[in-house]
Amino acid sequence: MDKKQLLRNLPKIDELLKEEIVNGYLQENSRTLVVDSLRQSIDHYRGEILKNNIDSFTKENVVNYFIDTLEENKSTKFKKVINATGVVIHTNLGRSLLAKEAIENVVKVSENYSNLEYDLKEGKRGSRYSHVEELIKKVTGAEAAMVVNNNAAAVMLALNTLCEEREAIVSRGQLVEIGGSFRVPDVMKFSRAHLVEVGTTNRTHLYDYENNINENTGVLLKVHTSNFKIMGFTEEVSSEEMVQLGGKYKLPVMEDIGSGTLVDFSKYGFTYEPTVQSSLEKGVDVVTFSGDKMLGGPQAGIIVGKKKYIDKMKKNQLTRALRIDKMTLAALEGTLKCYIDEKEAIENIPTLNMILSSEDIHKKRAQRLKRRLQNNVKDFNFKVSEDLSMVGGGSMPGERIPTYVVKVNSDKITAEKIEEKLRLSKNPIIVRVSKDEVILDVRTLFERDFNIIVEEFKKLLK
């Protein structure tokens, strides 16, 4: 059948509405939803015809596509997914998972009125930042603290407050770009601070900073390169040296440590990552970091440091535009409470627990998952293998964590097709594919995920 005839054969919406099965859906759903879904189905087949992808179709085909489309339109777009990639802080999958304490706190303040900006002791308006400021000070040792909606906002607010229309001196090797084309120079531009690059990509000396200080200098800026490493012939100015230089010229020193860990991971066999506490102990005046990376909390930009600088930031007009909501505050409070005891934090904050849990634990978990799959799913090959997980989230570049995975292949379906079907399933499962095998890394899986994985694998060949 030629293309024109196929297009003429496309059913009209009024015609489809008279179909018994469509009419049944009309009784249970709004007319707008049904009509929109029918239109999408017709448009889909029109597109397939114009692309020469089909040479025939039936009204039943259009109705079946309508049913799938209707169910998709009714479901929420923001979905739970199962992360079997082994990337703990997976940026595309929502970064850090919240601790139980944080989730409970969010539910409590979300389903009730709260004292968001009300001082219960004084009986008058209060500050939303008061709910977490004392906690942040306690776990970091800072003089003062405040929170905005993400770390880019924290950097922008701090720079705007410290050196609007003045110069911020930073090493050329620290002008980083993170995901989504976010670049430190661009944030500095929007903060209205004037960028002064010093040194070279691989080597920057203290004299590079000092030689560029003038009457218009507003801040000495240090940016932790948390998502890449430069190795070999390198030189970097330490925080202590920058603090001494800042003191000599009465200039504030600001450090953006990005991933924002409160735990010294070198104690657990990892490469050292600067902690918030260590930066403050070295005398850095203002430190900015993320809430949803190594901290293991919600998306937030946390600013800690000297009270005189934080107080100025609180009064900055940008602060209101960048402020966080009650649910984020509740989640952050619940997360920070775990940090009062580091052991409790590692046990209860999923991000920390996943990163620091032992290889032996994951070997046993991988064996359990393999047994369940083998006992319930036919026509697939399953084996447990050693592999490497990643921290992710632009944190600990180059760090790989020994883990165990379940590798899957089949003579009846390709690894790429398995990946696609799992990703598009009712319970989306995100996996890795390597050398014609699907890889399920148990480091980022929960026990509750195992049954779902088994059920979705059962459907793959149907």
Curated annotation (Swiss-Prot):
Function per UniProt: Converts seryl-tRNA(Sec) to selenocysteinyl-tRNA(Sec) required for selenoprotein biosynthesis.
Listed GO CC annotations: cytoplasm
Pathway participation: Aminoacyl-tRNA biosynthesis; selenocysteinyl-tRNA(Sec) biosynthesis; selenocysteinyl-tRNA(Sec) from L-seryl-tRNA(Sec) (bacterial route): step 1/1
Compartments reported by the entry: Cytoplasm
Residues bearing the modification N6-(pyridoxal phosphate)lysine: 293
Keywords noted in UniProt: Cytoplasm, Protein biosynthesis, Pyridoxal phosphate, Selenium, Transferase
EC code: 2.9.1.1
InterPro entries the record matches: PyrdxlP-dep_Trfase, PyrdxlP-dep_Trfase_major, SelA-like, SelA_trans, SelA_trans_N_dom
Name of the protein in question: L-seryl-tRNA(Sec) selenium transferase
Entries under Gene3D superfamilies matching the protein: 3.90.1150.180, Type I PLP-dependent aspartate aminotransferase-like (Major domain)
HAMAP family: SelA
SUPFAM superfamilies: PLP-dependent transferases
GO process terms (BP): conversion of seryl-tRNAsec to selenocys-tRNAsec; selenocysteine incorporation
Reaction it catalyzes: L-seryl-tRNA(Sec) + selenophosphate + H(+) = L-selenocysteinyl-tRNA(Sec) + phosphate
Family listed: Belongs to the SelA family.
Gene that specifies this protein: selA
Essential cofactor(s): pyridoxal 5'-phosphate
GO function term, MF aspect, one: L-seryl-tRNA(Sec) selenium transferase activity
Top class in the EC scheme: transferase
Organism, as annotated: Clostridium botulinum (strain Kyoto / Type A2)
Domain of life of the native organism: Bacteria
Record carries keyword Protein biosynthesis: yes
